[in-house]
Amino acid sequence: MRAQSKDFNDVITQIKEGGNKIGMTTLSKEALQLASMFSFNMSDDIKSLLDGMTVLKITKNKTGTTATFFDNSVKAFDEAGYTSIDVSSYVDRNTVRVFGKRRWLSIREAHIITTTDRGTNISIFGKFKIRTIRRVLKNNDLRKLF
């Protein structure tokens, strides 16, 4: 994020101090509100998958930004027919392809995607747009995470 990098860094600091979780118990109301505005410049297919998920943590390092989603993210990928995520199939540094039963899906701006038993990680190179994760947080009861 260019314009709000200071605010973003403040959020990251609070996340780290709060045990790397975004939630009512670990972030101030202002930081939670700011974090809820982050979204990714991705295809509509992926946005629709992400809309039903709860953001568990956001971390930032030299190579990009990683958002970790709650367990139901894995279920959402399964239901959409994306049975495996091939993190080695870079088209370029801004595109990763998710392999599904039906087709390859290109995810713009994604650097790497991994699924674990704790959730789905999406690492982002560069661009952030302030838009849609607001819906993700609003549609989920964050208290169920704690």
Language-model features: locations:
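Boundary at the C-terminal end of the N-terminal hydrophobic targeting segment
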Residues: 3-5
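Early exported N-terminus immediately downstream of N-terminal targeting peptides
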Residues: 7-73
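Localized chelating/binding microdomains
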Residues: 35-38, 108, 122-123, 134-136
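Short connector loops at helix/strand junctions that flank enzyme active sites
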Residues: 50-51, 91-93, 107
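Surface-exposed flexible segments
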Residues: 65-80, 124-125, 135-138
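Short Gly/Thr-rich strand-loop-strand
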Residues: 76-102
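A short, solvent-exposed beta-edge/loop patch
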Residues: 99-130
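C-terminal partner/receptor-binding element of secreted or periplasmic proteins
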Residues: 126-146
